[in-house]
Amino acid sequence: MKNLNIRNEKKEDYRAVENLIRESFWNVYRPGCLEHYVIHKLRDDVDFIPELSFVMELDGEIIGQNMFMKANIKADDGRDVPIMTMGPICIAPEFKGKGYGKILLDYSLERAKEYGCQALCFEGNINFYGKSGFTFASNFGIRYHGLPE
């Protein structure tokens, strides 16, 4: 894994990153994808954390991406519990299954922890994230608003 670099995403990277996300998620969970559009819109959200938006480069080419947002969980007692959300993390299709995703995930989580992240919720493939210790939010009584337990 020579010439591997993870750095903060720059505005000049946005188009390349959105194309990468589209390629990475195309026809994975549904016909086509919308993750690239979601990222495009989230960057303008007040809860977007630019300091925690990363790209992974291999020999100067962007092959991976991850980002974080501020969020809250509304507790049953009415409290707001500050958390972060993450993703979608992605790796270029030709580099999937080679350990790059795990490297990017570990790096991203360490930076988020340094930034003050104490809890994290996101949607993703449990087969990938479970290897890093993640489990279902429902195990902690966390659910989408309005959905039954």
Language-model features, listed with the residues they occupy:
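Conserved N-terminal entry element of GNAT/NAT acetyltransferase domains
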Residues: M1-E12, N19
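Conserved acidic functional residues
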Residues: E9, G124-N125
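Active-site rim helix/loop that mediates acceptor-substrate recognition in acyltransferases
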Residues: E18, F25, Y29-M67, N72
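Conserved acetyl-CoA binding element of GNAT-fold acetyltransferases
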Residues: G78-P93
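Conserved acetyl-CoA pyrophosphate-binding loop and the N-cap/start of the following alpha-helix
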Residues: F95-Y107, C117
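Conserved GNAT acetyl-CoA-binding A-motif
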Residues: E110-G124
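Conserved catalytic-core motifs of GNAT/GCN5-like acyltransferases
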Residues: E123, T135-E149
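Conserved active-site tyrosine of GNAT-family acetyltransferases
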Residues: Y129, F134
